[in-house]
């Protein structure tokens, strides 16, 4: 075969392969894309937003700057927060209100909803209803909140991690159940559910009217059925979360799904968490994700870097893709180090790790 014949036959073969490939591609179903986004909770100052854009973030949640002396963000505050984010190529997707935080009730500035104190709780609920209306007017689709009395429970001493990092930990056997009651006193499961129901009955219809998603964080961590410090932790189990969502069924009533916290509810999180993600995700009840890993299990765990915990994050992100989850994956409770007291290096590590996972799972088809 001379050179001209070789080139001619090679070209014909290439054309045939190309034609076959085109036919095969045309007949194949389009690849399933990963819809989730890298995100974080943040302040909305320009310098901070610029630094987040540097790491490839395009979506955030947080509290907007407020006028001095004001407790609640006004509509203009929300618009300024959204505009500040957009100026840096970032979407402001979820608002953090000034009440119903994860702090312990004795430190909470506005505890009336969780203490069932009237008329103060009705006033606070009205303020949240106004926030929902303002979110709709400002073009921000969701807000997140906690229904917690004890706040986030951890042991005072941190645990050595890799390098010079330290990790937060919880071990119920090493905690102090005899710790005095909070100002809430004894709160049985029935009383806790009454307070939750009172809140949801007044908030969910407004959220539906204005099409704003309400994303509730589970109680962190779950504790035994007898509770802790006199408080039954009703949102500290998977069954509790299911009951919570059933109280007022709505596409706008769902979860700020802290994967770390839910893992803390389980005896074998590495095996169990995937089906939990699948359960809530397939029902479109996951509005935001705190993408955090642990080593351990219910009542005894350590919060670690995302790549070294008991939950396989590759498998986890595949399930989020499977259920078409389209919200944010946020780092949360990152390790600390002596030269990184604010955790910025740890957050940067998590941003890169999560971004790479999203890109990888997107290519898997």
Regions found by a protein language model. Name each.
Residues 3-21, 32-35, 114-115, 126, ...:
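Histidine-acidic metal/acid-base catalytic patches
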Residues 20-43, 50:
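C-terminal segment of N-terminal export signals and the immediately downstream linker at the start
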Residues 39, 72, 122, 193-194, ...:
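Residue-level marker of alpha-helix boundaries and capping positions
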Residues 42-46, 66, 96-101, 147-151, ...:
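Active-site-proximal loop/turn and secondary-structure-junction residues that shape catalytic pockets
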Residues 44-63:
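Catalytic domains of carbohydrate-active enzymes, especially glycoside hydrolases
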Residues 63-197, 201, 208-209:
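Structural motif corresponding to the early beta-alpha repeats
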Residues 180-195, 221-232, 303:
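Surface-exposed cleft-lining segments at the edges of enzyme active sites
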């Amino acid at each position: 075969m001379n050179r001209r014949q070789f080139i001619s036959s090679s070209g014909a073969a290439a054309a045939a392969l190309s034609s076959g490939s085109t036919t095969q591609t045309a007949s194949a179903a389009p690849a399933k894309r990963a819809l989730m986004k890298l995100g974080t909770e943040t302040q909305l100052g320009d310098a901070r937003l610029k630094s987040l854009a540097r790491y490839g973030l395009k979506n955030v949640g947080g509290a907007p700057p407020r006028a001095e002396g004001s407790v609640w963000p006004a509509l203009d505050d929300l618009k300024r927060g959204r505009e500040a984010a957009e100026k840096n190529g970032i979407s402001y997707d979820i608002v953090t209100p000034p009440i119903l935080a994860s702090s312990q009730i004795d430190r909470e500035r506005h505890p009336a909803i969780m203490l069932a104190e009237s008329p103060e709780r009705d006033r606070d609920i009205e303020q949240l209803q106004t926030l929902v209306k303002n979110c709709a007017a400002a073009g921000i689709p969701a807000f997140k909140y906690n229904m917690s009395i004890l706040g986030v429970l951890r042991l005072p001493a941190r645990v050595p991690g890799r390098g010079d990092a330290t990790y937060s930990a919880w071990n119920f056997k090493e905690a102090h159940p005899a710790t005095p009651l909070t100002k809430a006193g004894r709160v049985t499961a029935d009383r806790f559910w009454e307070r939750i129901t009172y809140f949801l009955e007044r908030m969910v219809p407004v959220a539906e009217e204005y099409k704003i998603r309400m994303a509730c964080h589970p109680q962190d961590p779950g504790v035994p059925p007898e509770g802790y410090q006199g408080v039954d932790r009703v949102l500290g189990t998977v069954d509790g979360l299911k009951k919570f969502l059933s109280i007022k069924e709505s596409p706008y009533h769902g979860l700020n799904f802290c994967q770390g916290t839910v893992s803390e509810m389980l005896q074998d999180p590495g095996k169990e968490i995937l089906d939990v993600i699948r359960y809530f995700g397939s029902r479109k009840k996951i509005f935001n994700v705190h993408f955090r890993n642990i080593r351990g299990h219910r009542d005894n765990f350590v919060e670690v870097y995302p790549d070294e915990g008991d939950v396989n994050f590759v498998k986890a992100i595949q399930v989020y893709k499977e259920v078409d989850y389209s919200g944010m994956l946020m780092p949360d409770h990152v390790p600390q180090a002596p030269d990184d007291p604010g955790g910025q290096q740890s957050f940067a590590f998590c941003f890169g790790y999560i971004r790479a996972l999203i890109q990888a799972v997107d290519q898997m088809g």
